[in-house]
């Protein structure tokens, strides 16, 4: 699947550990409501491992392809290869971008960036987009870093106007629009979908 920055507009991230009900049903509802990309992030307390993780990933990939949205895997290079995922998203503490790009020459690659130092040290020419944040404080990630705020999005867009950027961290239906107005190509979110009983309305407002 060829990358297009419009894929970032409503970027849903989820693993089974984020869900109070079947993640397959949540993804189906979110996909039919209009999310533009999905990242499978099976990490942290109560997350699946082994065969259970792989089987869920296969099901979620099939749902994504039914709705023609990219299926991206967080961090797990082996799983991304095994499932022939559309892309992989890596953090600063994961495998180096150069190594990942060699393994996935034609896949979508996203990179998390939280500081100017990380930005300056990253091979931006090898990634399709950057995930910037946390924009606001968040409780979803146990290892979340200090919030960077909207101003940093504006600064990044001035420095790298053609680099696709998706914001992450503390994003919900009440603040998503101001992030887009600040210059982000999209917003990514977890609990805004997994914690609501009204997925259609939430996706429309994100």
Curated annotation (Swiss-Prot):
Mg(2+) binds at residues 75, 94. One of its GO terms (cellular component) is cytoplasm. This is Thiamine-phosphate synthase. HAMAP family: TMP_synthase (MF_00097). One of its GO terms (biological process) is thiamine diphosphate biosynthetic process. SUPFAM superfamilies: Thiamin phosphate synthase (SSF51391). GO terms for molecular function: magnesium ion binding; thiamine-phosphate diphosphorylase activity. 4-amino-2-methyl-5-(diphosphooxymethyl)pyrimidine binds at residues 39-43, 74, 112, 141. The gene is thiE. Its EC number is 2.5.1.3. Belongs to the thiamine-phosphate synthase family. InterPro entries: Aldolase_TIM, ThiamineP_synth_sf, ThiamineP_synth_TenI, TMP_synthase. Binds 1 Mg(2+) ion per subunit. It comes from the Bacteria. Its cofactor is Mg(2+). The keyword Metal-binding applies. Keywords: Magnesium, Metal-binding, Thiamine biosynthesis, Transferase. CDD domains: TMP_TenI. Condenses 4-methyl-5-(beta-hydroxyethyl)thiazole monophosphate (THZ-P) and 2-methyl-4-amino-5-hydroxymethyl pyrimidine pyrophosphate (HMP-PP) to form thiamine monophosphate (TMP). The keyword Magnesium applies.
């Amino acid at each position: 699947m060829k990358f297009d920055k419009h894929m970032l507009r409503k970027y849903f991230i989820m693993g089974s550990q984020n869900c109070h009900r079947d993640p397959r049903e949540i993804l189906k509802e979110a996909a039919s409501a209009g999310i533009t990309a999905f990242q499978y992030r099976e990490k942290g307390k109560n997350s699946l491992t082994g065969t259970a993780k792989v089987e869920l990933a296969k099901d979620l990939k099939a749902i994504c392809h039914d709705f023609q949205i990219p299926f991206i895997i967080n961090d797990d290079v082996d799983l991304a290869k095994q499932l022939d995922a559309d892309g992989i998203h890596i953090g600063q503490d994961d495998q180096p971008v150069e190594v990942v790009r060699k393994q996935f020459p034609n896949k979508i690659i996203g990179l998390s960036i939280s500081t100017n130092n990380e930005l300056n040290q990253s091979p931006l020419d090898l990634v399709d987009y950057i995930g910037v944040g946390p924009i606001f404080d968040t409780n979803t990630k146990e290892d979340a870093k200090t919030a960077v705020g909207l101003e940093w999005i504006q600064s990044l867009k001035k420095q790298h106007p053609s680099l696709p950027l998706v914001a992450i961290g503390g994003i919900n239906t009440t603040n998503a629009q101001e992030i887009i107005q600040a210059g982000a190509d999209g917003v990514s979110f977890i609990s805004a979908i997994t914690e609501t009983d009204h997925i259609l309305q939430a996706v429309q407002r994100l």
